[in-house]
Amino acid sequence: YSIVMITKNELDVLVEKYETVDFIKDDPVQFPHKFKDKKSIELAGFIASLVAYGSRQQFIKKLNELFDLAEHEPLNFIQNFEPKILGDFNYRFGKPDDFAEIFLILKELYNTSDGLEELFAYGFSQEKMFECVVDYFYSRASEKAKQGFYQMIPNPHNGGAMKRMCMFLRWMVRKGPVDLGIWNFI
């Protein structure tokens, strides 16, 4: 009994520390918080989650660069994406071609469907949410897809850690001071 109480107390302390608006400014969740329309929020969150590994200071710097390239309009950026706009943008394993590969797949998704929410909701309805999402990206990746692409879109079939995709999903479905809670299918 006391072990459970200690754990609950420790969790309560963490909630008080991190479940606050002040937490947003130093976290990748700051990027989807900058937008009002649902599709821009989900795209900003997805893009931020792709790059959220390594040094927090470094990936936030790179995300700021990327959102500058997107002129702070993620939906317009993706719907009209052309690889040349990336120039030499990269982050760790992710090279310009890797980002272009992902953004071209997102372009197809947003120009032919309702976007990420529809894709995740379909996967959820099939009880294979992450597998469906990953399969969508992998089935559309060209033969040019390299290590960086697979680093950003890990494969749960091969034991790939889905930590960043879970973080993105949490931002989209959970309501709170930090999480946006714009998806209701779960």
What are the roles of these predicted feature ranges?
Residues 3-186:
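HhH-family (HhH-GPD) DNA N-glycosylase catalytic core used in base-excision repair
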